[in-house]
């Protein structure tokens, strides 16, 4: 495998066809690919659990954007929450979500569509926790799609005292390969300015690090640490 092959080619955009594209879960259920893109891999589990723990830390009503392999979602369900709303746009993944929802301990509200379509229909001050982990759908938004959601919706949809956590591993893996060797510095320089623009306060943004060992064949992440943000709305 050529390590130099970028995840997105210049100008590439999958958005129009993503919802109909096959969700390719491998037989062992350790990898999910859509349109040949490495969307989710089972080795991410400890990190996904870290994000889920933050998102569910206030209890109440949790919104998750992106269902993937249900790694974070299943962890969210293990906490004493009340409702679990999940936005997912891919048909095959959404079918999995509907099936999974039937056996969960808390009320699950599956919402089908791109977050750009669904989020505007959701009310202000509605969620105690939000976990945003979706796959970038174009080269143009590869490094920035999370900020579009956070600025337009995350801040307004959180209740005061509510918590946001998120990741963009496809972006961060690239930044840590080519631009940064310090994950804290990467987060402070490339993420925090956008969070402040969205209306969050610097003193309400904290992060924790964890050691991780991505498999050598992983196409999107090779750094030995991951970072979990905790962002509280005042």
From Swiss-Prot:
All residue ranges annotated as the RMT2 domain in the record: 1-234
UniProt-annotated binding residues for S-adenosyl-L-methionine: 18, 48, 67-72, 88-90, 115-116, 133
SUPFAM superfamilies: S-adenosyl-L-methionine-dependent methyltransferases
Keyword line: Methyltransferase, S-adenosyl-L-methionine, Transferase
Gene Ontology cellular-component annotations: cytoplasm; nucleus
Cited Gene3D superfamilies: Vaccinia Virus protein VP39 (3.40.50.150)
GO biological process: creatine biosynthetic process; methylation
EC id: 2.1.1.2
UniProt-listed CDD domains: AdoMet_MTases
Reaction catalysis annotation: guanidinoacetate + S-adenosyl-L-methionine = creatine + S-adenosyl-L-homocysteine + H(+)
GO molecular function: guanidinoacetate N-methyltransferase activity
Pathway: Amine and polyamine biosynthesis; creatine biosynthesis; creatine from L-arginine and glycine: step 2/2
Presence of the UniProt keyword Transferase in the record: yes
Domain of life where this protein originates: Eukaryota
Binding site for guanidinoacetate: 40, 44, 133, 169-170
Subunit field text: Monomer.
Entry similarity comment: Belongs to the class I-like SAM-binding methyltransferase superfamily. RMT2 methyltransferase family.
Main function: Converts guanidinoacetate to creatine, using S-adenosylmethionine as the methyl donor. Important in nervous system development.
Record protein name field: Guanidinoacetate N-methyltransferase
Organism of provenance: Danio rerio
Biological classification of the source: Eukaryota, Metazoa, Chordata, Craniata, Vertebrata
